[in-house]
Amino acid sequence: MAFEMRPEWKKFRYRGRTLEELLKMDIEELARLFPARQRRSLLRGLTPAQQKLLLKVRKIRRRLEEGRLKRPPVIRTHVRDMVILPEMVGLTIAVYNGKEFIPVKIVPEMIGHYLGEFSPTTRIVQHGEPGLKATRSSLHVASK
């Protein structure tokens, strides 16, 4: 018996639900599908900053559907603790990491994660060669 590829297997599903089904759910229904930390965050209610971000997302979605926008603009935000919801899929959100805004293209696989997970706040330090004026410990390195 030959293995048969089915297009349904390629479709994105979150806990057995398609993206279209997720878009029809309200936040309370959606929260039941999320892990405990995200579920608790959503069921406690959104902060004013999170509500403002969600309003911007919905406004841009509405303008895209009406045809007033050709492509979605980048939304800049400091809200790193916002759970990525299905209505954000397809948008680019620039998340502040403490120094700059990192653009994050939202794809379906990101649903249920936090925005801050995709904008790292620290980098791995790569020190230069030891030598004069490199670090305080270079005082003990003999000069040439």
Curated annotation (Swiss-Prot):
Keywords: Ribonucleoprotein, Ribosomal protein, RNA-binding, rRNA-binding. It comes from the Archaea. GO terms for cellular component: cytosolic small ribosomal subunit. GO terms for molecular function: rRNA binding; structural constituent of ribosome. Pfam families: Ribosomal_S19. Transmembrane segments: none annotated. The keyword Ribosomal protein applies. PROSITE patterns: RIBOSOMAL_S19. The keyword Ribonucleoprotein applies. One of its GO terms (biological process) is ribosomal small subunit assembly. PANTHER family: RIBOSOMAL PROTEIN S19P FAMILY MEMBER, SMALL RIBOSOMAL SUBUNIT PROTEIN US19. Protein S19 forms a complex with S13 that binds strongly to the 16S ribosomal RNA. Belongs to the universal ribosomal protein uS19 family. HAMAP family: Ribosomal_uS19 (MF_00531). This is Small ribosomal subunit protein uS19. The lineage of its organism: Archaea, Thermoproteota, Thermoprotei, Desulfurococcales, Desulfurococcaceae.
